[in-house]
Amino acid sequence: IPYPNKNGEPCGFGFRNGAFLQNIRKHILTQRNIRVIEGTVTHLIEEEDTIVGVNYKRKLAADEESLYAHLTVVTDGPLSKFREKLSKPVNKLNGYFLGLLLKNCELPFANHGHLIMGDHPPMVIYPVTSTSWRVLIDFKGEKPPRLGRDFKKFLLEEFEQAMPKSARAAFVAAVEEGKFKTFPNHRLPANPIKRQGAVLLGDALNMRHPLTGGGMSAAFNDVLRLSNNLEKIIDFSNLRQLGKAVQKFYETRHLGTQTTNILADGLYGVVYNPDLRKAFFEYVSRGDKYAEETCSILAGLNKDKKLLLNHFIAMARYGTQLKISAEKPGVVVTESLSMVKDAVGIITPLLLSEKPDPGNKLMLEALNRIV
């Protein structure tokens, strides 16, 4: 699926997340107006109802130290220990990704990500270097998969034949090598609490399923929107101005992340529904706007929630048309209606979690009760 060729041709990059972040840190270290202190924050310092700084401990140090600031930016990731002080989180664990590395192989589309769907858990494959590919396999449930010799056998039996032929030997080698990584997949709608002197952003505030790789796009959106608000403040000791900037960020950040969130969790629901999974594949296989506009939302290039909703419903409708035309109409009418109902059931709660306007909220709540 190509990126939309508008206003110049955009391109995507596959990379190791850890290496990418380390390179960002290297760049930060070169900036003269930034002082870097490495340590572990232990507490937020509170005076009355205002956060005025942090207590932290340097590596190998015995004693804690304190830092004070007019604004503390909390970005301690998916396992945030300060989340509950700055939001009302409703965190849902969807399952786990198992990661392994394919070496020295080719995939059907060089320099592209691949989503492998079928009668097995979904797999995501994307390049991380010129000679290696990261494979992520989804495992539902509240507990991570149990690793061991039997697990290797299970992986080969369940997924080897689902891999593209050109990558099967590399997949077998990666399984036998056994260098697996597991990490949890969360869904966490943003529900911040305004606290004077602090702001929460990134995965600490809001998470979606990583199936579409939208976490970094959402984090950069948070950074950009918060920065744009803060750069207008001349004096950070003016707590009223500072509070307004943070409040505006909380009120508008969803405009940059809502399509990323809805598509990620919506597609995760689709890939586990056999009828919708087939409908999605056939829909984007039509090419043209059916593929390009969908990809533009996936890549974070298009943030039009209405466009996303239109494509989602059109995909379900197209699936029903294919099912009815392929078989006797009387046999599949019930299944077709069920497909549309399933699609509405997937998308409605996601739309409700992204600050709909009052009129749409009433309609969505009514739909949610029906499905």
Language-model segments: residues:
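FAD/FMN-dependent oxidoreductases across multiple families
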Residues: K143-Y250
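A generic "binding-loop/recognition-motif" signal
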Residues: T40-V41, P78, P121, T131, ...
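Active-site substrate-recognition segment that forms the wall
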Residues: G113-P144, Q161-A162, I193-K194
